[in-house]
Amino acid sequence: MGFSFFGLFGQNHNFKIVDVNEFAEYIKDTAVTVVDVRTPAEHAEGHIPGTDFNIDVLEDTYTKIATETLPKDKPVALYCRSGNRSKTAARILADKGYEVVELGTGFRGWVAAGKKAVKP
């Protein structure tokens, strides 16, 4: 990784919120697990290249599925449409001991910044 998590956590959360360019750089690392926490329908409309999983944070089973699916020994990079749902997902995973980075502006910010998206 290009940076250390030591001392990077904010007062109100124990995960790192990053901008589009930081997120793009972070997910270049193949050790990072990239998760889209939007609905399957939203994911099907387009997603960030390299996304490993689509686990809908609005589902009651999110925590169970995420903790059973995501390796705890690898950092997790989360995004949603605008950054709200992914913050919820990030709090859940960080509280479970995961190292989490969250795309503050979500997929909308990614697209608005001119980054590549996978579309059907």
Q: Which sequence ranges carry the predicted segments?
A:
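Short, surface-exposed ligand- or partner-binding patches at beta-edge/loop junctions that are enriched
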Residues: 79
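Rhodanese-like catalytic fold shared by cysteine-dependent sulfurtransferases
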Residues: 2-32, 40-75, 84-120
